[in-house]
Amino acid sequence: HHQMTKLRKCGLVTAQVDGKWHRNILRGGSMAAATSLVESNALAVLEIRLSELAQMVEPSETRMAIAAEEDERAFSIRISEPGPTIDGCDAACALVRDLGLAGESQREGDTLARDLLVELSSAQQPITILVLSERLSESRGRVSTVIDRMRSAGLVERVPMIDRIPQDVFSGLVRQLDARGEDWLMTRGGLGRLDEKVSKALVDGASKGSLDIDTVRGIISTVTITDQRVLLNTLGGRMPYGFRLAGADGASVSNRVMRLAERSLRRVRTVSQRLEESLSGNI
């Protein structure tokens, strides 16, 4: 019964009532037809809901300046038609609930998912988990959980905070020089892998106390981003990451999610066709 309820809910199966009997049948009379109906309905509903999201997103010329990392996580989004209004829940709150961004067991009065979506929709630059948790007065764990749901839905993507590298390299240099000395910096600290002029300028500046973040930025400006990230790692730091909406405007975000949904539904259609061929003995 539980599984049949799920099949009816997703639209693959419908029930015909004959007196006291409920007969469950595939919509359209076949797996391929049922899948086609589900696909058409899902894309139509999703397009409507994403148009609501697009109106929330502030266009930005700087949001997409940094290339995002490739995200291999599985696409997952809940597609639900607009439901009845709930007291204390505005349009943005209803949208995150219907898209599954608030989770399966949202607590009454919990607006974290809504607040995060609003915050990211207006952000002009990627924002770290730490900054988001401080702005919303929430734990980093809860913020990270909601961000992961948004990433799975294709709404949000993670990007390296390139502008933060000089700051973290400076902190690592000063800390490791005091703790381990110049020899360690040139060997295990990773400076020996860089051009001699670059490594010498960094070590001399750190030793004389004349180094600051802007100076580090100028010195490593000729170093590739890949080597900057390696240097940061060998100095004991970690590449800082931020999160942003996956588009410069609402239309871009909506188009990305629609592409991911269409790709997933094509896979479902392919599986249904193969299943039908198998059942009919054509394979």
Describe every region a protein language model picked out.
Residues 17-23, 109, 160-172, 235-241:
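Short, Lys/Arg-rich nucleic-acid/phosphate-binding segment
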